[in-house]
Curated annotation (Swiss-Prot):
This is Serine/threonine-protein kinase PknF. SMART domains: S_TKc. It comes from Mycobacterium bovis (strain ATCC BAA-935 / AF2122/97). The modification Phosphoserine is found at S290. Residues 332-376 are annotated as: Disordered. Gene3D superfamilies: Phosphorylase Kinase, domain 1, Transferase(Phosphotransferase) domain 1. Residues 338-376 have a biased composition (Low complexity). GO terms for molecular function: ATP binding; protein serine kinase activity; protein serine/threonine kinase activity. Dephosphorylated by PstP.
């Protein structure tokens, strides 16, 4: 249960909640002794209860607290109170790049602004790498901008020390990666292999791609498909998304290479090449060999956990991806065979509308053309048909339900899970009840909640919602 405003936790006075996710909540809180307000992150009790997790949390929080850099959100303190781990960080009064994309630049940010952001974050990452600390969760949501409309704005990277543990024994991080971080994670991180700074460089490049185009490099409603694309698909050419960015194609081809050895050795090398191609300073052919900093390997037991847990999760997701891919090819064949029948024409009040088959790719914008009495409008839909309650990303994208209603990729309250919803804001926890199916084993809450969201928003039965979500997610 979230902490109430005015309540006290570990000596901090809660001012208000700033956000929440699958691992806990973040609050604006008054420091117990100093005249300042901090960001207090409180982890859930079930997360905090894991002994190995707690030890790693304390170890990495201590390491993060040693970082002192103008572009890193500082960690001041950490502890445990009433069975919950907490960490005290700088409060950044401003926004994040996800909000900037949503509110100001839905089709991508200006090149000079992206260069400034990526350069600042690259410097922060290389500073941490030199001190043998990885971030492992670089993404737009973790890039904060203080005083965004002021000349003295600050760009800061958040969540060092508490984000992206790929060997999380509780499975929470792996679950989170399937719906969010997976859009930016390097192949070796998804496979649970040993990491160095080039994994963060990959994530930084994927983030830059998103900032420049308005969407991450690989997109699909099913996270399993995105994982398979990170592992095997060629890096997308950014010029195919935004033609004027074609000069950046070789930069992203290198930065998003599957093998770490083929990428830029340091994050600032990538930022320099990006800035040069966008018209800033830097050397596009900077091939100086800078040895990546190898982060100290964890104990053998942790490596074994990584080798077992992450590939196990990945194997399950890849099975899903194969099923989805086969289904997509079959559907594509069916559509090609029946293309004339799939284009339907309806006439109403002298207006003819041709509707092409739905596509998961982002088509070029279409402008209706009017021709007097026989007005004709031809439009290609910009969103795929989706199932309410099914997994989705990126956050803020839109789709169309089978009834023609607009669906929004929104966050399910109290989790990091993003699902299709008929409401644009955070999806409230469902209140509808459902009769248990005696033929089905009880589902975990993370699977049951989206089903009930579907029931509540669409009026369908539990079985109907479950089957639609199962098909959409590619589950067997």
């Amino acid at each position: 249960m979230p902490l109430a405003e005015g309540s006290t936790f570990a000596g901090f006075t809660i001012v208000r909640q700033l956000g929440s996710g699958g691992m806990g909540e973040v609050y604006l809180a008054r420091h117990p002794r100093l005249p300042r307000q901090d960001a207090l992150k409180v982890l859930r009790a079930d997360v905090s209860a894991d002994g190995e997790y707690r030890a790693r949390f304390n170890r990495e929080a201590d390491a993060a607290a040693s970082l002192w850099h103008p572009h890193i959100v500082a960690v001041h303190d950490r502890g445990e109170f009433d069975g919950q781990l907490w960490i005290d960080m700088d409060f950044v009064d401003g926004t994040d790049t996800v909000s900037l994309l949503r509110d100001r630049y839905p089709n991508g940010m200006p090149g000079p602004e992206v260069t400034e952001i990526i350069t600042a974050v690259a410097e922060a990452l290389d500073y941490a790498h030199e001190r043998r600390l990885l971030h492992r969760d670089v993404k737009p949501a973790n890039i904060l901008i203080a005083n965004p409309d002021s000349p003295d704005r600050r760009i800061m990277l958040a969540d060092f020390g508490i984000a992206g543990w790929v060997d999380d024994p509780s499975g929470l991080t792996a679950t989170n990666m399937t719906v969010g971080t997976v859009s930016y994670a390097a192949p070796e991180q998804l496979m649970g292999n040993e990491l160095d700074g080039r994994a963060d460089q990959y994530a930084l490049a994927a983030t830059a791609f998103h900032l420049l185009t308005g969407s991450p490099p690989f997109q699909h409603a099913n996270p399993a498909v995105v994982i398979s694309q990170h592992l095997s698909a060629s890096p997308p050419a950014i010029g195919d998304r935004v033609p004027e960015l074609t000069p950046l194609d070789p930069v992203f081809a290198k930065a998003l290479a599957k093998q770490p050895k083929d990428r830029y050795q340091r994050c600032v090398d990538f930022a320099r090449a990006l800035g040069h191609r966008l018209g800033g300073a830097g050397d596009p052919d900077d091939t100086r060999v800078s040895q990546p900093v190898a982060v100290a390997a964890p104990a053998k037991r942790s490596l074994l956990r990584t080798a077992v847990i992450v590939p196990a999760v990945l194997a399950m997701l890849l099975v899903m991806a194969v099923a989805v891919t086969v289904r997509e090819f079959q559907r594509a064949d069916d559509e090609r065979a029946a293309q004339p029948a799939r284009t339907r024409t309806t006439t109403s009040a002298g207006t003819t509308t041709s509707v092409a088959p739905a596509s998961t790719t982002r088509p070029a914008p279409t402008t209706p053309t009017t021709t007097g009495a026989a007005d004709t409008a031809t439009a290609s839909p910009t969103a795929a048909v989706v199932a309410i309650g099914a997994l989705c990303f990126p956050l803020g994208s839109t789709g169309t339900t089978k009834t023609g209603a607009t669906a929004y990729c929104s966050t399910l309250q109290g989790t990091n899970t993003t699902i299709w919803s008929l409401t644009e804001d955070t999806v409230a926890s469902p209140t509808v009840t459902a009769t248990a199916d005696p033929t089905e084993a009880p589902l975990p809450i993370e699977q049951e909640s989206p089903i009930r969201v579907c029931m509540q928003q669409t009026g369908q039965t539990r079985r109907e919602c479950r089957e639609e979500i199962r098909r959409s997610n590619g589950w067997p």
